[in-house]
Amino acid sequence: MSWAHTPTLTQYLIEERRRYPQASGDFNALILDMARACKAIARQVAYGALAKSNHAVTTTINVQGEEQKPLDVISNECFMRLTEWGGYLAAMASEEMDEPYLIPEQYPRGRYLLLFDPLDGSSNIDVNVSVGSIFSVLRAPEGKTEITVDDFLQPGTQQVAAGYAIYGPTTMLVLTVGRGVVGFTLDPDFGEFMLTHPNIRIPESTKEFAINTSNARFWEPPVKRYVDECLKGKTGPRGKDFNMRWVASLVAETHRILSRGGVFLYPRDNKEPKKPGRLRLLYECNPIGMIVEQAGGRASTGYGPVLEVQPTELHQRIGFVFGSREEVERIEQYHNDPDASPVDLPLFAERTLFRDETL
């Protein structure tokens, strides 16, 4: 296929920069270096089992209490080493690191902060399911001599850019700089990200939802109600049939919803009281939330906009619901106004496999 008239990521960023003549170019350089990191990670992921002999990394436990696979460590190093040197970052924070990483003194200090999940869904690698990388860019505070954790604790509304790479049948980079959402496909022959999806939009309505029903007994009543209504299909209060999906890869779930609509729920529950949510606010929910909102969807905690949440911890977890606007707003309504349009609440009442007799 000829790419003669298809913009590259570099060309796209140059065109965006022309809208702001005062811009220094640091922002473009940061995005391009993150794209380089994603290319490097894509190559490592593509080797699959063939790379096991090269991944002689001892298994460790990260700050989240989760087992780090060798590719988690390698991907984290890719992001750090390919972005620390350029002079546009003041510090970075990763899901895989306990504390922020301050840019070494031998490199110029920049104006931005980078947060990232270097390899989301890495537990799926062994079964060859799509995985990805997620990133968020914030402005560093001016006039401070040293960056601290508090400087990263900015609500999602303060993000300058957000994006993810998905490593699947093709490698794609999905990006927002606050002017809609665009998607780039990696051309394996030329090694360039090419603009293939210039205006990604999420349909307002959907007949598809994604949730892990094995956690049903831990859900709050509004979530149980929503899922019950979906499962009742045409004979229920929604008057239409729904399909259910669950990939256990946030990037893969997001990409499907951006491609054809849907709603994703990883809600707050009582499975582990110390972890009322599962997904990380700063590394996952905020960047995905910005992308979804810029694509015309809605991103929520279940109660209200996730991008307006004021973070309190670097590795804070939170309930997360996002996707087609109509469905997310319905879920918010069920949380905030439980008496609206009452329906039968018992979840899966005719499906004894999931029925919770304590409800």
Swiss-Prot record:
| EC number(s) recorded for this UniProt protein | 3.1.3.11
Matching SUPFAM superfamilies: Carbohydrate phosphatase
The reply to whether Hydrolase figures as a keyword in the UniProt entry is yes
Q: Name one Pfam family in it.
A: FBPase
How the cofactor is bound: the record states: Binds 2 magnesium ions per subunit.
Q: Where would you find this protein in the cell?
A: Cytoplasm
* MF GO annotations: fructose 1,6-bisphosphate 1-phosphatase activity; magnesium ion binding
What does the record give as its pathway?
Answer: Carbohydrate biosynthesis; gluconeogenesis
Q: Which keywords label this protein?
A: Carbohydrate metabolism, Cytoplasm, Hydrolase, Magnesium, Metal-binding
- Tell me the residue numbers annotated for binding Mg(2+) 2: D117, D120, E284
GO cellular-component terms in the record? cytosol
Q: What class of enzyme is it?
A: hydrolase
Provide the binding site for Mg(2+) 1. E95, D117, L119
Q: Where does substrate bind?
A: D120, G121, S122, S123, N212
GO biological process annotation, one example: sucrose biosynthetic process
Cofactors, names only: Mg(2+)
Q: HAMAP family annotated for this entry?
A: FBPase_class1
Spell out the NCBIfam families in the cross-references: PRK09293.1-1 (NF006778), PRK09293.1-3 (NF006779), PRK09293.1-4 (NF006780)
Q: Which PANTHER family match?
A: FRUCTOSE-1,6-BISPHOSPHATASE-RELATED, SEDOHEPTULOSE-1,7-BISPHOSPHATASE, CHLOROPLASTIC
Fill in the subunit field for this protein.
Answer: Homotetramer.
Family stated for the protein in its record = Belongs to the FBPase class 1 family.
- In its UniProt entry, what is this protein called? Fructose-1,6-bisphosphatase class 1
From which source organism is this entry? Hydrogenophilus thermoluteolus
Q: Which gene encodes it?
A: fbp
